[in-house]
Amino acid sequence: STITGNAEPLWVIDGVPMQKEVPTPPVSNTQIRSGDFSNIFATGIGGINPNDIESISVLKDAAAAAIYGSQAAGGVIVVTTKRGKSGPTHVNYSGTVSIQTRPVRSANLMNSREKLAWEQELWDEFAAAGYANNLQDGKSYYPVVGIVGMIRSGYGKYKGLSVAEQDARIAELGSHTTDWFEELFRTTVSTSHYLSISGGNPKMAYYLSMGYGNDQGIVLKNSYDRYNFNGKIDVTPNRVVSFGISTDFSYQTSKAPSSNVDMFKYAYFANPYERPYNDDGSYRADETYFSLSEINGSYTVALPENGFNLMREINETSAKSTSGNFTLTGNTTVNITKDLKFVGLASFSYISDHGENINGKNTYAAWMDRPFENNTTTSKRIYGSIYQTSTYNTNYMLRGHFAYGHTFNEIHRLNVLAGAQISRNYAKTIFTKRYGYDPVTGNHSTPLYPASGNNSVIDYDKLVSFGKTLDNSTGQAITENAMASFYGTIDYILLNRYVFNASVRSDGSNNFGSKEQFNATWSAGFSWNIDEESWMKGKISDVISSMTLRLATGYTGGVNKSVYPVIIMKYDNTFRISDTDSYRMGTISNAPNPHLSWEKTWDIKAGLDIGFFKDRLRLQVEAYNLSLIHISEPTRLQL
């Protein structure tokens, strides 16, 4: 439904669209790796206990999604949760215990002796002669494979070793085989508990549920906890008025290492002769995982002086995330006459997300996350970092419509609906990154930019770039979205066989230019319940229990939030200095566009649904054509 925008479907929970936008801080690197809940729990159903779900349905065409208008361009997923019913009190408990075993090292992987022998064969066949020639002319190329190639070529600390010393070192490496799958992964036990209480009478029904889940990841120091509470009360004091109130609360926490090294990839490709620890228990640097690429000239790898050790990354980095989500919803139905009623819905939600990412000063993650260009193998400067985010999101939605339904002469059924909706979302993210962080004291000391040369001169351009890095490491991001919608639908049903429907809708959004804020869409559909025909009765109905032909066409509008109707300035590293102030300069990256309008999707669809043997077997056949109109995409203009 879009090229550059968001094509994700709209999630609707008990009539409330989940569209709580989360601003993204302008910070590079994947900061909160293990559990960034912001979008998961804001736009989907991540915070709902699966045991509370009554049903899930998908609205796929324009006619079916008409009530959600512009938000439905990517489709609609409707989730209905359980509610109380008239009757005795029901208490339900369910619990699960699951065991996940760690990945097992493949029997086809070589052990240390086999790997070293293979590396020696490759050295003898492809590199030994080139190495000997290189000693003479200094220009001959020879490939280095594994630790054997490093030792035989005298790379780094192996320079000057005699052949006997080289053989002794290789033999020592072959005396131990590391199963990296056993070192990095674990067998875990995860549990979940769910308790619900429901019941009521014709005047009032209630539903309460609580849930807890704990998932232990197979990666070391990885865990996830989830708490849920759900409460609903539905009251019907008389035949005229009914109303209900529901509240949902969920809280999630996640912990994991923050290292950006793929542990599954490392476990498979790391050499078996590498060890996680020295004999004295200290971390042992991996000599081959990163270094071989540099030795063979593909690219330069910057490593800290103490080298790379994945166990250090696991133990001395952390990514923690917490999310609390509270939603309060109220609904009412007023039966004005026998055929006319008013339905209202109001919802308010609040989300609070917090993330914290810590890189210990001795880790490779901290080494690669430095505010200035001193990450070479000769630098001895080490310091940690901490990155923290807090996001606060509020959202409200008000919707009301009048619905009229009447049957004429027992063969004509007319349903008419007209309503309006307003919604607003406000989200604010505050982020800060501190270098030189000490996790013991909680303090930090921002490192000074390194001087070059004996006169302690600092290059001005690099110093300005350093200042920009520090400026961008702390700040805030704010998003605000408001919408107003007006809609109407009409359905006509003849003989309970032929169904005609049509809908119109107009949506207004602050995401567009001042001249294009409102967008009108329409849809129309027809369905034929063939199984209601007289010639479908009798023996044929024992085989074909239901058959419906569907035709639908219409438009839906979409909001592409990757483009903006307002002027945007992108700041750079240049300054303008006056007598009293210093201003950062920038360039216009987005010109104002009062004509920026909605993206539209037009679809035509035909479908046939057939149920066999009392609908025990169902067949669905569909054909459709989807067209995108008014798509926003980058275009080069000739000046």
Per-range role (PLM):
Residues 11, 277, 492:
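Short aromatic-centered micro-motifs
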Residues 72, 199-203, 212, 494, ...:
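A generic beta-sheet turn/junction motif
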Residues 6, 25, 32-35, 40-84, ...:
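Outer-membrane beta-barrel proteins
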Residues 3-5, 9-10, 19-47, 85-220, ...:
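Residues embedded in well-ordered regular secondary structure
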Residues 8, 226, 232-241, 246-251, ...:
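Extracellular/periplasmic, surface-exposed regions of secreted and cell-surface proteins
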Residues 20-21, 67-69, 87-88, 101-104, ...:
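Switch/connector loops and helix/strand junctions flanking conserved nucleotide-binding motifs
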Residues 106, 110-161, 250-300, 355-371, ...:
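A surface-exposed, glycine/aromatic-enriched loop/edge motif typical of exported proteins
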